[in-house]
């Protein structure tokens, strides 16, 4: 630990950035594969690929809500457990973990019951048509029955990470992703199960990951053990955890609201093909944003440590290294999408009509995709510098203040209303990127003014 601290304060910034960013980047890429592999296989189902992909895409709002509830307990409980560990109060840390596990299991029962029976009506509301609804229901109901595994994996894996077992935590995702990738073609094409096979593959992969987590947290290697005696809910233990997790819950649940806003509007103005295109666009957007998150996760400890040590020259170097990588990646990826939109659309479906429509939509929806690198790198840097509230506000600025209202406002000013809905994304992207970047550099300049009074190495 001492050597790590010395390296963080004196070692090569670029080398340290690479050492810390690569594992985080690998984890994000694995997560990305987990998220989009089902859609790639489904989109290439013979004859029904386009309709099936559209139907499965309509399940996204429910999936995001399940994720949000997992984060409520996981993202709120893990930091509290870490604090208790730092205070040498292992018993309290284990009690926190046990209480969070109980909440996740209670949520699993409630969400499974509510969403299983309500999903046909919800999917209709989200924009499902007679052609896409059967595929949406087929995938959704199987996935929902496996919610207990999903909540376990997303919520409890954070307690492995917070103990310092980063590799074990990463393996949780890798194991699930590999099983999902292997099972998808076997069940979908080998056994002819189609969409149902994709859902079963996802649930089985999550189940294996859940067993992996529980075996670790009840085994000999873990620092904190999951014990039955700690699963009885204690208000003084669980309420602070849920209070801390509410910001993560809000961030993820707003993604659900955003998805509903897009699909309901596009269903109304563009029909199934527009909703299907949105499913592909969401996946392509993840190809942009998730690697950026990995880079920023690697840069965060380096920026935070040197900021705390008042080594502002190293903070500056670390930030601009992160900023440069993020902007370069998004610019190159954006240029490739603008030049070869049909190629990117074709990755997700073999439906010719959907490919052509999606290729057109890519050039509208991602017209300002290059700006995402600016926004995410600056927003995450705010977080690394301890400015969590500003970081949260900047994230909500794009989604809640700009994008969601624009989805409903812009169609009033254009004859092609589906075009107007897609246009909301680049408008929100460029405005949010400009505001976030300007605010960060103003903050950064103020920080630089304090440099004269600080000792730098």
Describe each model-derived feature in a short phrase.
Residues 53-113, 150-169, 263, 277-341, ...:
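Small-residue-rich hydrophobic transmembrane alpha-helices
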Residues 42-64, 131-135, 195-196, 236-244, ...:
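Interfacial/gating helices of multi-pass transporter permease domains
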Residues 74, 143-161, 169-177, 198-211, ...:
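Short runs within selected transmembrane alpha-helices of multi-pass transporters and secretion channels
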Residues 19-38, 142, 176, 205-209, ...:
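Transmembrane helical elements of multi-pass membrane transporters/channels
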Residues 8-48, 61-76, 80, 105-112, ...:
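N-terminal transmembrane alpha-helices
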Residues 1-23, 81-148, 190-245, 303-368, ...:
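Short alpha-helical transmembrane segments in multi-pass integral membrane proteins
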Residues 22, 38, 77, 118-119, ...:
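Hydrophobic/aromatic residues in alpha-helical transmembrane segments
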Residues 29, 33-53, 123-130, 186-192, ...:
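Helix-terminus/linker motif at the lipid-water interface of multi-pass membrane proteins
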């Amino acid at each position: 630990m001492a050597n790590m601290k010395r390296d963080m304060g004196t070692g090569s910034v670029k080398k340290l950035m690479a050492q810390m960013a690569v594992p985080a980047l690998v984890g994000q890429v694995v997560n990305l594969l987990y998220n989009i592999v089902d859609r790639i296989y489904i989109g290439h189902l013979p004859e029904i690929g386009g309709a099936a992909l559209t139907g499965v895409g309509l399940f996204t709002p429910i999936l995001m809500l399940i994720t949000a509830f997992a984060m409520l307990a996981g993202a709120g409980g893990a930091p509290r457990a870490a604090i208790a560990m730092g205070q040498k109060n292992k018993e309290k840390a284990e009690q926190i973990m046990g209480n969070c596990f109980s909440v996740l299991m209670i949520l699993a029962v409630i969400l499974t019951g509510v969403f299983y029976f309500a999903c046909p009506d919800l999917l209709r509301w989200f924009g499902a048509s007679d052609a896409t609804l059967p595929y949406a229901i087929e995938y959704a109901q199987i996935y929902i029955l496996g919610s207990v595994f999903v909540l376990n994996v997303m919520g409890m894996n954070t307690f492995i990470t917070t103990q310092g077992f980063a590799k074990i935590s990463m393996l949780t995702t890798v194991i699930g992703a590999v099983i999902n990738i292997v099972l998808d073609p076997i069940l979908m094409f080998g056994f002819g199960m189609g969409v149902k096979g994709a859902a079963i593959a996802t649930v089985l992969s999550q189940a294996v990951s859940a067993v992996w987590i529980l075996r670790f947290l009840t085994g000999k290697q873990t620092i904190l053990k999951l014990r039955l005696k700690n699963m009885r809910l204690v208000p003084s233990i669980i309420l602070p955890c849920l209070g801390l997790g509410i910001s993560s819950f809000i961030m993820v649940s707003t993604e659900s609201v955003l998805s509903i806003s897009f699909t309901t509007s596009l269903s109304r103005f563009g029909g199934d093909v527009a909703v299907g295109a949105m499913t592909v666009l969401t996946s392509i957007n993840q190809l942009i944003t998730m690697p950026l998150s990995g880079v920023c996760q690697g840069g965060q400890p380096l920026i935070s440590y040197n900021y705390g040590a008042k080594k502002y020259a190293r903070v500056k170097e670390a930030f601009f290294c992160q900023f440069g990588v993020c902007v370069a990646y998004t610019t190159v990826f954006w240029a490739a999408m603008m030049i070869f939109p049909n190629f990117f659309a074709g990755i997700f479906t073999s439906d010719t009509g959907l490919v052509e429509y999606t290729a057109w939509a890519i050039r509208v929806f991602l017209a300002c995709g290059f700006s995402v690198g600016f926004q995410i790198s600056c927003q995450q840097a705010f977080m690394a510098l301890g400015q969590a509230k500003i970081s949260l506000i900047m994230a909500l600025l794009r989604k809640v203040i700009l994008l969601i209202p624009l989805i409903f406002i812009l169609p009033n000013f254009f004859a092609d209303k589906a075009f107007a809905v897609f246009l909301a994304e680049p408008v929100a992207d460029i405005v949010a990127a400009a505001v976030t970047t300007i605010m960060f550099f103003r903050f950064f300049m103020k920080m630089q003014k304090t440099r004269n009074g600080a000792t730098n190495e």
